[in-house]
Amino acid sequence: MTRKKRRLILIAACGSVLALAVGLILYAMSGSIVFFRSPTDIAKQAIAPGTRLRLGGLVKDGSLRRGPDQTVDFAVTDTNETVEVHYKGLLPDLFREGQGVVAEGVLEPGGQFRADTVLAKHDESYMPREVADALKAQGRWQEGGPNRGGPAPKPATAAADSTLGPRSER
């Protein structure tokens, strides 16, 4: 066997082992991959009930309803479509109506979403691009985050607010 032929066989064997390793890794991860969807994606695509996914958008104003035993119902919207969400548990401190949210759970028959994890958006990095684009088109978005229709509140400082107490300078 010539040196060139041995090298070719070695390269082919290494390539086969690498392809097998990548295939096994992807197969092992396929059960834990959770796809991200917006309410419009859920409405337009035929997603089977029981499918595990992440739902992202804004908590619709006026949709938050608290029930017994820490149950919470609310609606997530991307300004085009809305999905009803049912969640049992403690909500994050930053969770409120009009705020961005990502909920992970299962799509149930009838289009309702049963969430087992809710994450509140605290900066624009959690906002899905489609939702941010829709908010920009409606004029509800300014650079740095959604626009609530008024100026941003000024931060409270000891010098500006006497209720915080005197400012000590050393």
Curated annotation (Swiss-Prot):
HAMAP family tied to this protein: CcmE (MF_01959)
Region (Disordered) location: 132-170
Gene Ontology cellular component terms for the protein in this record: plasma membrane
Protein species of origin: Methylobacterium radiotolerans (strain ATCC 27329 / DSM 1819 / JCM 2831 / NBRC 15690 / NCIMB 10815 / 0-1)
GO MF, any single term: heme binding
Topological type in the membrane: Single-pass type II membrane protein
UniProt family annotation: Belongs to the CcmE/CycJ family.
Job description of the protein: Heme chaperone required for the biogenesis of c-type cytochromes. Transiently binds heme delivered by CcmC and transfers the heme to apo-cytochromes in a process facilitated by CcmF and CcmH.
Main location: membrane
Pfam families hit by this protein: CcmE (PF03100)
Iron listed as a keyword: yes
UniProt topological domain (Periplasmic) ranges: 29-170
Protein name listed in UniProt: Cytochrome c-type biogenesis protein CcmE
Ranges that cross the membrane: 8-28
NCBIfam families recorded: PRK13254.1-1 (NF009727), PRK13254.1-5 (NF009731)
